[in-house]
Amino acid sequence: MVALKRFRATGPSFADLVPYAGLVDNGVLLLKDGSLMAGWYFAGPDSDSATDFERNELSRQINAILSRLGTGWMIQVEAARIPTYDYPSEDRCHFPDAVTRAIDAERRAHFARERGHFESKHALILTYRPSEAKKTAAQQIHLLGRGEP
């Protein structure tokens, strides 16, 4: 029999390092420190074709919304570039006139000639960490069986 003890890691395991405790509702995670986390995928307007005024106005609106959250909130915005390998076939083209169908045919031909096409996926993740007073009260309720003596 081989002694495996020397091959075992003595540091924290993967389960010790990840912050997730459990799923409390559809799309809402409870973290080990008592925080709640939820995330959503989103798609915004094309910022490359927007004017400076439009980009600034969108930024102002987002900042105004996020500033209402108050303390205890953390915001993460993630972007992933995913390679694409196919373009919709010509029989799936639903453009109404010859000009837009011709533009789509040119795009399809360009897609077939060139390599390195990507789509962007954006995600917004909000985490709320209650203050220590609220966290302590919640822990007491949980430990005492929902406030029962």
Swiss-Prot record:
Alphabetized UniProt keyword annotations: Conjugation, Plasmid
Top-rank lineage group of the source organism: Bacteria
Family membership noted in the UniProt record: Belongs to the TrbE/VirB4 family.
Name of protein: Probable conjugal transfer protein TrbE part 1
Gene from which this protein is expressed: trbEA
